[in-house]
């Protein structure tokens, strides 16, 4: 999550790093995201994203913009799978965050899109968050006026969700 229309201190990477520090985990959280980017863009940036030799965990939350652009779930899945394989080959743990397509995309698209996250998480035995925006999506108090992107309060909720997964990995 790039922190669309938020001050840097409210970006997910900043909030998550703060949350980690508060509980005694001193990690540097790198924001490798780009606003509006797709899984293909994430794959293209992966070499740069993983260029830091000290990376231990990758939080992979791509695909929502693919859906918004109507990119076929098979194409998104292929990109995500390539990202997963490259990351695991480098012995970096992955927290894989899923998304959910709205019903307005039709049953076939929704089914293919929604199930690809669970399928990949099982296939590669990943730490899995079924829906990254759980508790945030469709809540006007936790989203910007566009109704799509989380606001500062929404980012706090998302950070807590990711933090629970990180604790499982580094306990």
Model feature map: region roles:
Residues 15-18, 22, 41-171:
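Alpha-helical cap/lid subdomain in secreted, periplasmic
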Residues 7, 34-37, 71, 150:
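Short, surface-exposed alpha-helical recognition segments that flank or form part
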């Amino acid at each position: 999550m790039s922190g669309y229309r938020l001050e840097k201190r409210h970006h997910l990477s900043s909030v998550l790093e703060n949350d980690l520090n508060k509980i005694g985990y001193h990690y540097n959280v790198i924001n490798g995201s780009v606003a509006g980017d797709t899984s293909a863009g994430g794959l293209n940036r992966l070499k740069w994203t993983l260029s830091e030799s000290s990376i231990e965990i990758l939080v992979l939350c791509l695909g929502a913009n693919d859906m918004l652009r109507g990119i076929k779930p098979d194409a998104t899945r292929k990109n995500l799978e390539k990202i997963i394989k490259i990351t695991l080959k480098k012995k970096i743990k992955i927290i894989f965050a899923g998304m959910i397509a709205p019903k307005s995309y039709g049953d076939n698209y929704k089914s293919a899109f929604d199930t690809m996250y669970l399928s990949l998480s099982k296939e590669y035995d990943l730490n899995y968050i079924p829906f990254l925006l759980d508790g945030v999506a469709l809540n006007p108090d936790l989203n910007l006026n566009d109704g799509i992107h989380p606001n500062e309060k929404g980012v706090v909720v998302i950070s807590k969700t990711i933090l629970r997964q990180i604790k499982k990995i580094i306990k």
